[in-house]
Regions:
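Expand to "…catalyze enediolate/carbanion chemistry for C-C bond making/breaking, isomerization
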Residues: 1-112
Length: 112
């Protein structure tokens, strides 16, 4: 059986007995570009304490792509795994935020 690496670096780090490091960042392109080249295992786009903007989240994910890193590594796994923290699911019935974030391309959800 051939061992494969995980697309989600956070899960991979914990699965190997390590500690996964991540940081919360705003949903903006500058943060996406800066954090994509960081040494974090993952980043969490903050959507709970700021307006939910699925278009901005999509742009952030696009700007995280490093085509050279993908070509050099022969893997589509991102260097830094993107997650999204969604707004609280209260009386507003906001579960759809999780679906939107996952459909846009995040690798996981942080529930408040």
């Amino acid at each position: 059986m051939v061992a494969t690496s995980r697309l989600n670096g956070l899960v991979g780090a914990m699965e190997n007995g390590g500690i996964a490091f991540s940081a919360f960042v705003p949903m903006d392109i500058n943060s996406a570009q800066a954090m994509a080249a960081s040494r974090f295992d993952g980043i969490i786009y903050e959507g709970e304490h700021s307006p939910w903007d699925i278009v901005a989240l999509g742009h952030c994910l696009q700007y995280m792509l490093d085509r050279r890193q993908i070509a050099d590594s022969d893997s589509i796994a991102p260097r830094v795994t993107p997650l999204a923290r969604i707004p609280v699911n209260g009386i507003e019935m906001g579960q759809w935020h999780a679906k939107q974030a996952l459909d846009t391309g995040t690798y996981g959800i942080v529930w408040p």
